[in-house]
């Protein structure tokens, strides 16, 4: 039986109106300081897991009490999830971390049907939640020996660059066809698909994060946890099959030209990566500043193609969610989804994921057009690689010694 932990957190909130603070997401104004306090221990005799399957937190937002319900995202990793990095002498080192007891959750606010949440509970609470149409971010404050967290709206994060950023896909890349009305599209549970992806982190990212592989991994995990929620509306499960870090040098020529980099990355995947890790799609994450306003590029309607089921994404923001949405955008191109036009909608007042321009708004949803285009692409092309449902990590429990298994690429000392 799954152990369920009901944790009540009393968050005493003290708004700092007009003040600012430097957080991981940047300089933030108008935030609330909150102190999580666990009030309800586990039942007597219960065995506490490091990260429980279900958690609930109670706190106040703007003086109003809310209950945040979280459930572990058990489909986040594939059962054979692997991580790859390289030694200084060029050896490829493959490990299989034990990811069953991870700390990434999805959830909602109790009594708010439209609420959502994506939270990391690894070191305090970090992530975002939607409450009554407003999106809030939460993260631990950088105070020694303190449980203080900051809760704030994204609009209160000072923007380093106000210029609009864009996806590099243009009409020359996209094939425009008439879009069916939603009433013309038959949808059933048979349309559920499963996309196993590999994220490749280039050497510019390693430099940006000062070689801190743990920080890079956490950044990627949080991104994938965020986009799994967005893709659930398209009836597509996103599963992370692998993370490769080019720790010593790039294995392709990563250029400021997004188009050239995409081409090189696709060719490398077809001749190398696809033979090492079972996956359906690969995305390159880079700190390289692409030419012009471009922050991402992907082939359109290319899922399962060895060279073309790929995308490239610039790590363009200190706000994880914004980079995650860019990743979700490029992956959707691979699934036959085009840029939104004027008639497309994902709710009144919202900018949708497939907008060609990425601005400072918090984006979360695919539009009705994206939904229809994705369904049409799957119905027409039926890409075979995303048909199979992979086993979840919690279905396999193989005892091992240590935290990792090293494959043959690494010489044992």
Curated annotation (Swiss-Prot):
Catalytic residues as annotated in Swiss-Prot or TrEMBL:
330
Q: How is the cofactor bound?
A: Binds 1 zinc ion per subunit.
Record keywords: Blood coagulation cascade activating toxin, Calcium, Disulfide bond, Hemostasis impairing toxin, Hydrolase, Metal-binding, Metalloprotease, Protease, Prothrombin activator, Secreted, Signal, Toxin, Zinc, Zymogen
Q: Which GO terms describe its biological process?
A: proteolysis
Q: Which residues form the signal peptide?
A: 1-20
Query: Binding of Zn(2+): at which residues?
Result: 329, 333, 339
Name the Enzyme Commission number(s) assigned to this protein. Answer: 3.4.24.-
Q: Where in the cell is it found?
A: Secreted
Where does the chain bind Ca(2+) 2?
400, 403, 405, 407, 413
**Domain of life, per lineage:** Eukaryota
What residues does the annotated propeptide cover?
A: 21-189, 391-413
**Cofactors:** Zn(2+)
In the record, the note on similarity to other proteins reads:
Belongs to the venom metalloproteinase (M12B) family. P-I subfamily.
Q: What is the protein name stated in its UniProt record?
A: Snake venom metalloproteinase AaPA
What organism is this sequence from?
Answer: Deinagkistrodon acutus (Hundred-pace snake)
């Amino acid at each position: 039986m799954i152990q369920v932990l009901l944790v009540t957190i009393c968050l005493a909130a003290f708004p700092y109106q007009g003040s600012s603070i430097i957080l991981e997401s940047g300089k933030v104004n108008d935030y609330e300081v909150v102190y999580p306090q666990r009030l309800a221990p586990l039942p007597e005799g219960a065995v506490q897991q490091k990260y429980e399957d279900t958690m609930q937190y109670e706190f106040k937002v703007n003086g109003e009490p809310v209950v945040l319900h979280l459930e572990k995202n058990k489909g986040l990793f594939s059962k054979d999830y692997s991580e790859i990095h390289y030694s200084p002498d060029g050896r490829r080192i493959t490990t299989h971390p034990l990811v069953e007891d991870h700390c990434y959750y999805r959830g909602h606010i109790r009594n708010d049907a439209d609420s959502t949440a994506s939270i990391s509970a690894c070191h305090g609470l970090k992530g975002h939640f939607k409450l009554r149409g407003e999106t809030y971010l939460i993260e631990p404050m950088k105070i020694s020996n303190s449980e203080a967290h900051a809760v704030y709206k994204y609009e209160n994060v000072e923007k380093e660059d106000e210029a609009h950023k864009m996806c590099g896909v243009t009409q020359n890349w996209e094939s425009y066809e008439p879009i069916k009305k939603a009433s013309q599209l038959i949808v059933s549970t048979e349309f559920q698909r499963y996309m196993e992806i590999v994220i490749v982190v280039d050497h510019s990212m390693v430099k940006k994060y000062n070689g801190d592989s743990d920080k890079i991994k956490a950044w990627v995990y949080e991104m994938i946890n965020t986009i799994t929620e967005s893709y659930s509306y398209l009836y597509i499960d996103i599963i992370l099959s692998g993370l490769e870090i080019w720790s010593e040098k790039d294995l392709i020529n990563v250029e400021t030209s997004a188009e050239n980099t995409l081409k090189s990355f696709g060719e490398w995947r077809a001749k190398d990566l696809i033979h090492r890790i079972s996956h359906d799609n690969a995305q390159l994450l880079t700190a390289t500043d692409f030419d012009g306003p471009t922050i991402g590029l992907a082939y359109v309607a290319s899922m399962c193609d060895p060279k073309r089921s790929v995308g490239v994404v610039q790590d363009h923001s200190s706000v994880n969610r914004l980079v995650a949405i860019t990743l979700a955008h490029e992956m959707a191109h691979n699934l036959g989804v085009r840029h939104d036009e004027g008639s497309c909608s994902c709710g009144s007042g919202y900018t949708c994921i497939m907008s060609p321009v990425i601005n400072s708004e918090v984006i979360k949803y695919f539009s009705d057009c994206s939904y229809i285009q994705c369904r049409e692409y799957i119905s027409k092309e039926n890409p075979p690689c995303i048909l199979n449902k992979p086993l979840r990590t919690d279905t396999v429990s193989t005892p091992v010694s240590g935290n990792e298994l090293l494959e043959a690429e690494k010489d044992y000392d």
